[in-house]
Amino acid sequence: LADVLRWRWQAARQGLPRPPVEPIPTQPADLPFLHANRGPAQQPAVTWIGHATVLAQLGGLNLLTDPIFSTRASPVSFAGPRRAQPPGVALTELPPIDAVLVSHNHYDHLDLPSCRALAAQPGGGPLFVVPLGLADWFRRRGIARVVELDWWQHTPLDGVEITLVPAQHWSARGLNDRLKTLWGGFAVFAPDCQLFFAGDTGYSRDFA
């Protein structure tokens, strides 16, 4: 608490740097590669799309973490934190997604419009892998292909094992649901590659 108060005092006294007016330069994604990189000949690849949204291609699958493609991370479209940078890959430019890994329910990691668009992708929606307590939230919003995990539980998907691992964080989407659902990171084990996605976390003994 003392550190937080000191940081707030320093911010009030010294001010905070303003975000850049112009977008930060980006490296355009190789969209033909992303779409062709699938199946037995797939090369392990990770593409950072923005914030916590990452396209991970491994084990012949396309996995997407914490998808947020909306302009704001908020329960409403006209107010709330606004993204400073467009997504590096547009939602409509993504290759077919096999699974979506959601680390927790904060608005900057769980964006309903993005999830609904992914669930409606041509050829069938992906599997949504979520922490304990979140599956019902998805089902009540029309997204039925969902599995929820406790810490250290895993689910197999076409030869790839997806495990929810602990993180030092919390959950809430409103005033009355704080800590009502779990949060975490993901460890993904494929024959050709292993991936760790932390979600949101502070440093804790979970990393020991």
Indicate residue ranges for each PLM-predicted region.
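Structural motif
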Residues: 61-63, 99, 127, 160, ...
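Binuclear metal-ion centers of metallo-dependent hydrolases, dominated by the metallo-beta-lactamase
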Residues: 127, 139-158
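Short, polar loop motifs at secondary-structure junctions
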Residues: 50, 131-137, 150-152
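Active-site environment of divalent metal-dependent phosphoester hydrolases
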Residues: 106-110, 135-138, 153-156, 170-172, ...
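Metallo-beta-lactamase
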Residues: 1-93, 188-199
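Active-site-proximal loop/helix segments of hydrolase catalytic cores
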Residues: 113, 171-208
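Active-site metal-binding motif and surrounding structural segment of the metallo-beta-lactamase
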Residues: 77-129, 145-147
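Active-site metal-binding loops of divalent metal-dependent hydrolases
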Residues: 67-69, 105, 167-169, 199-201
